[in-house]
């Protein structure tokens, strides 16, 4: 008997329909359970799906697996029926998000934003800029994104230090973080949102960063205390590159928009050409492992 999989879009329908032993059923995110969908054993929510998708999970009595298309699972942990497995698309977006972070650092150090303004104003502002070469980089978070970030920084001869929840080969434990922060020219956040990481970048964390250092948030907005960061930016002591904010989307009248020393993008780090295909490639692999009774590679265990 075929396993029913609920799919949110046509890209997924094509990808999952190619699997043997699967009956892929298209559903409209936010809409009711489609005909034939009530027997679904696997649910694939859409990108950045919200509360409506989470509510759908409770309407599927045979549901056993929720397969996400994102690396982040904070919207789902603790909010799904007991006994239902939760798997992410870790590995699908790391390369493009690391590319975003690298671009942000280069933009700040080489002053591309300032040169773009000068171009619009027809001003020839030739001068020396800073460089990423040789900068000391601290990556907070030791997952797929951190590994991609480390690879992309290698050609710039940047000493890279990685911090994870526990110490292991090539990774420092989080207990060492307070002593490592002051030595970093740039701090890149790649952690998931958990009870331990929400607000971890607070006033004390930022105060440990040396003058002129750059904070790069490639993680999630709630990891950073916005008011604390805004205070440091307003004082022109630190700089920042943000792809995520808290709140998000950022209200049009929020003071963060006009903060000096800030490069801000609207949560597009993983949004590049081919991102959907990469996410479904990971999802299909996880679904295949589930059907074969094999361990899932991206299974969320506890808070993850």
PLM features per residue range, with description:
Residues 115-148, 175:
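Glycine-rich NAD(P)-binding loop of Rossmann-like domains
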Residues 1-45:
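N-terminal glycine-/charge-rich "phosphate-binding" loop or analogous flexible N-terminal tail
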Residues 166-255:
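Rossmann-like adenosine-cofactor binding region
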